[in-house]
Amino acid sequence: MEGIENIESKDFDIAEQLNLRIKLLGITEIIDNKLFERVHPCLVKNNTYIANVGGVMNAVILDGKPVGESVLQGEGAGPGPTSSALMSDLLSVLRGNIKYPFGIASNKRNKSAIYDVNNYVNSLYMRFEVKDKSGVLSQITKQLAKYKISIQRLIQIPDNIKKKASIIIITHNVR
């Protein structure tokens, strides 16, 4: 699990410039018949449903075959809604009302293989705060090339007063 404590206001501003939003997402999926679960900040396109869920509202997007995508939305942020939802969910699991509380039948949960997070493939957002001088970008891209990391988007934002720059890189999918 990774929270938003390392995200700075500058990252939100940069995301907005890129027509993206930063959202804390919980992701559960079955990959190669193994359970993958993760909570972490994600960049999502501004025009997606999840990007526009805000305030005390939370949403769950279920995507399955052959039904496609379904969205469940309701209050879930803030002390009242969060504690109420948490207690309700815990009681439902304890009473056995939820047959698949973690995406897999309860009686098979212990037998489930867990997908190795180190094998997960996704794109990455990187922000480097550097001195604004020649050769710095070249050093960064050489290191990325060394590890076969391909750049999808690159932006350099100069700070002429401090003689520094922010270099923002969004990669293609990497492992």
Role assignments for model-derived ranges:
Residues I27-E29, D63-K65, E129:
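A generic structural motif
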Residues M1-N52, M57-A59:
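Substrate-binding/catalytic subdomain of NAD(P)-dependent oxidoreductase enzymes
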Residues D63-G64, E69, Q73, G78-Y100:
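Helix-enriched interaction subdomains in cytosolic or periplasmic regions
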Residues I50, L72-A77, E129-K133:
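Hydrophobic alpha-helical bundle architecture
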Residues H40-K65, G76-G80, A145, I151-K162:
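Low-complexity, glycine/alanine/valine/leucine- and proline-rich hydrophobic stretches
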Residues E2-K10, M57, A77, P81-S88, ...:
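Conserved active-site and cofactor/substrate-binding residues in soluble primary-metabolism enzymes
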Residues A85, L90-R175:
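A conserved regulatory-domain signal marking ACT and ACT-like small-molecule sensing domains
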Residues N33, V56-N58, P66, N122-L124, ...:
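A generic structural signal for well-ordered coil/turn residues at beta-strand boundaries
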